UniProtKB/Swiss-Prot annotation:
Disulfide bonds: none annotated. Coiled coil: none annotated. It comes from the Eukaryota. Keywords: Cytoplasm, Developmental protein, Nucleus, Proteasome. One of its GO terms (cellular component) is cytoplasm. Transmembrane segments: none annotated. The lineage of its organism: Eukaryota, Metazoa, Ecdysozoa, Nematoda, Chromadorea. Residues 7-20, 57-70 have a biased composition (Basic and acidic residues). This is Probable 26S proteasome complex subunit dss-1.
Amino acid sequence: MSSTTVTKKDQKTVVEKKETEEEEFEEFPIQEWPERADGEDDEVNVWEDNWDDETHESEFSKQLKEELRKGGHPIA
């Protein structure tokens, strides 16, 4: 009578193999994008042009500095 025994080494190999298989990346379907019309503008603005024009002295920062002064905290 023969019996099959599974050793810890064999179990470890099976676990490592499963982990390796799970690390594969999921493949996504190819997306179809519409063709661009001839009259469309090449320079599309996708963000605000004035992003760095914000003032550093906003109403919030003024109120915060005032509250810190009231609390006795030094302000740089």
